[in-house]
């Protein structure tokens, strides 16, 4: 994790060295899971995604804080990426069946209702597997705090609520599509009679959890196979099945019912 993981190695040139770093870490004996967090989409390319997809102990999951999709909002934010490239990155993810998480902002100065509608349409179109959002909050001394067309707090809140309501439905449909599948779960704790863990598709502290029952004790920190039996918007429920070390499932097989949230 870093402020921008994809910038690794760019001090020696323009090309990110993150793919090479991932390969080297993945080759270390005992590394069960390797997850890249907070990668800005500007430097995400097919080379990085193909490297991640090829290595069995690298999670099919990437966290890309996109912030917005309106080109003029991205420009006002001083983001060097373009709306067109962000859409292309999303296409590359879906093509490879990889899990995509993003963070979006509402209420940046100058955000019109048309800009927000474009953002909502983008979320409907892409159907992010994981998404967080926050409202713009001006900080003293920053350029954005001095920009004209500041958005009223009540408008920010209303847009935030609409966006998160939309994503709630998206997330529920995505999770329901996982019912009946089996995934490898890292056991993190026990809560009452059930265990709590996460698969490669849930990042720690930011995503939901998998709650599962087991007829036999599970060691905290171990990996078990869990069959998903029920879904909520952000959490999954299941039951432990027999242990297999090679129980990695492809996300492209988990999220096929895309019409459910239209």
Describe each PLM feature range.
Residues 135, 146-262:
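Terminal RNA-binding accessory module
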């Amino acid at each position: 994790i870093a402020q921008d993981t994809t910038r690794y190695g760019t001090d020696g040139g323009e090309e990110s060295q993150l793919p090479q770093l991932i390969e080297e870490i993945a080759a270390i004996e005992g590394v069960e899971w390797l997850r890249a967090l907070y990668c800005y989409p500007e430097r995400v390319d097919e080379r990085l995604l193909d490297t991640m997809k090829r290595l069995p102990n690298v999670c099919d999951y990437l966290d890309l804080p996109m912030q917005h999709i309106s080109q003029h909002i991205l420009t006002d934010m001083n983001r060097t990426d373009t709306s067109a490239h962000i859409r292309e990155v999303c296409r590359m993810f879906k093509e490879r069946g990889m899990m995509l998480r993003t963070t979006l902002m509402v209420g940046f100065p100058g955000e019109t209702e048309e800009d927000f509608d474009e953002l909502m349409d983008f979320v409907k179109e892409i159907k992010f597997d994981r998404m967080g959002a926050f409202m713009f909050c001006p900080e003293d001394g920053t350029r954005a705090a001095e920009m004209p067309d500041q958005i009223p707090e009540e408008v920010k809140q209303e847009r935030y609520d609409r966006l998160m309501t939309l994503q709630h439905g998206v997330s529920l449909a995505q999770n329901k599509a996982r019912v009946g599948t089996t995934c490898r779960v890292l056991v993190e704790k026990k809560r009452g009679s059930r265990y709590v863990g996460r698969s490669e598709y849930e990042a720690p502290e930011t995503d939901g959890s998998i709650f599962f029952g087991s007829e036999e004790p599970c060691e905290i920190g171990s990996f078990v196979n869990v069959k998903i039996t029920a879904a909520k918007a952000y959490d999954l429920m299941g039951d432990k099945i027999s242990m297999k070390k090679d129980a990695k499932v492809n996300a492209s097989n988990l999220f096929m019912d895309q019409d459910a949230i239209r």
